[in-house]
Design a protein with these regions (language model features):
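Binding-site signature for planar aromatic cofactors or substrates
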Residues: 1-188
Length: 188
């Protein structure tokens, strides 16, 4: 049976911390619905019971950014692949925060930055739903993929920024803001 909450409860936060993967769904008023899996360790943070954020590394598209800039609606979903079975959905409003934005430093300090980070998605929680999850398989994590961070580590920083500057439209033609700097990863 589904239960609804106004904010994240402590048991929700504990469940989120155990998840190796989460899913992000966004849509603008018109066009495609985007659904993306995310799963690099340490990229999702619960900032408060009504605020979460996650690191976004440059990839093949930037649909989430375009949709949040146009509409703001976002749903995040986690599935407990261990016992007990549980699905948790976070409904909210999100926005992209790029390294050039004034709030970047404070938000980025909450994460260990990975090579190729282009933005952080900052989400205000408007509601939380849990459901049984009895249809979700029981699985164990073998390991996290390191391909994306390794790919970004191997890039020339100037060429990387130039490539990002050319990616300012979603699949449906919605505008995005490109990051203006290459982040190599954690600083000493």
């Amino acid at each position: 049976m589904a239960e609804f909450f106004d904010s994240l409860m402590e048991d929700h936060v504990e469940m989120i911390a155990r998840q190796p993967v989460f899913f992000v769904a966004t849509a603008a008023a018109d066009g495609r619905i985007n659904l993306s899996p995310k799963g690099l360790a340490g990229t999702f943070q619960v900032l408060s019971p009504t605020r979460v954020a996650y690191l976004d590394l440059a990839g093949s598209g930037n649909e989430t950014h375009a949709h949040l800039a146009a509409d703001g609606r976002i749903t995040l979903m986690m599935c407990n692949f261990e016992a007990p079975a549980l699905i948790l959905r976070i409904y909210g409003r999100g926005r992209p925060v790029l390294p050039a934005d004034p709030e970047w430093e404070g938000l980025a300090a909450r994460f260990t930055l990975l090579p190729g980070v282009r933005q952080i998605f900052d989400v205000t929680v408007e509601g939380v739903q849990t459901s049984c999850g009895w249809g979700v398989p029981v699985m164990t994590l073998d390991h996290h993929r390191e391909t994306l961070p390794r790919y970004h580590t191997a890039q020339d920083p100037e060429a990387w920024v130039k490539k990002q500057a050319g990616r300012t439209r979603s699949l449906d033609g919605l505008p995005t803001r490109a990051t203006d700097r290459y982040i190599a990863g954690p600083t000493e």
